[in-house]
Amino acid sequence: DKSELILNGDGSVYHLKLKPKNLSSKIILVGDPFRVDKITKHFEKIEFEVQNREFKSVTGYYNSNRITVISTGIGSGNIDIVLNELDALVNIDLNTGKINKSLKKLELIRIGTSGAIQNNIPVDSFLISKMAIDVDGFLLNYDLTKIDNAKFNNYINKEHQIQEEIYCYKSSEELFNKFNSTDVKSGITITCSGFYSSQGRSIRLNNSYNNHLDKLKKIYYDNNNATNLEMETAIIYGMSNLLGHKAISLNAILANRELEEYSANPDKTIENLIDYVLKRI
């Protein structure tokens, strides 16, 4: 069915405009298209570059490692597009539309920005997401039977009286160990569908969630605190678990919601996180 996986006239996938040969198995994901160049300026060689809408992709070499950097844009819906198309590039025969007999694993490393919800996580620090909670249930559109969520569901029902089905997804243990260090905080990331109301912000419209932040920051599961709010990580983790890829998410903490603080130099903090990731990739 040509309407399921849509290809462009040149055979590239619809949104990313990539062909299989353009893609490395090691992929850095960022939200902002302008952040792609902040990473690839460190590369020794650029092999390929393309942009369509907010999706900018550059493949090149850093310390002899072939790496693709892709901007996803903002939010769960964009991650759904990007991960489906990345998986199709390596696991679908684009000529026939059939699934390949031998499936490939991608290594997905997100470099993002986030706001902390605990007062012991300072602005300008780095945070690596051990797990991530899809608080708005975006991935419930998919068959999640292969995800073992019973333990977390029991916890959230019993300790927080939340009866809705909320899923918690794990990072790749291998990548977590690779990128974790004493220089970073770690914990559970809360992935929200938006920036304002779903993260407890009220500007001119009142928020229908009372004490939203107070409830979220009390989550403590499997020896990890809920640490930060953002809009992508749980979808990356959940889809990677379902599709068989490895994923890790690192965030530059630009705000602390508890302390009502924001970074005085966010660009510098993001640059520092980029350096941290590239040294360990």
Where are the model-predicted features located?
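Polyanion-binding loop/helix "lid" in catalytic or ligand-binding cores
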Residues: 167-171, 228-233
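Glycine-rich phosphate/pyrophosphate-binding loops
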Residues: 243-258
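Glycine-rich beta-alpha junction loops
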Residues: 115, 132, 190-197, 235, ...
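Short pre-catalytic strand/loop immediately N-terminal to key active-site residues, enriched for Gly-Thr
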Residues: 223-227
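His/Asp/Glu-rich mid-to-C-terminal helical/loop segments that flank catalytic regions of hydrolases
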Residues: 256-281
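Short glycine-rich, acidic/polar surface loops and turns
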Residues: 229-245
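Metabolite-binding pocket within alpha/beta catalytic cores that recognizes anionic/polar moieties
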Residues: 1-167
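Active-site rim beta-loop-alpha module in soluble metabolic enzymes
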Residues: 152-221
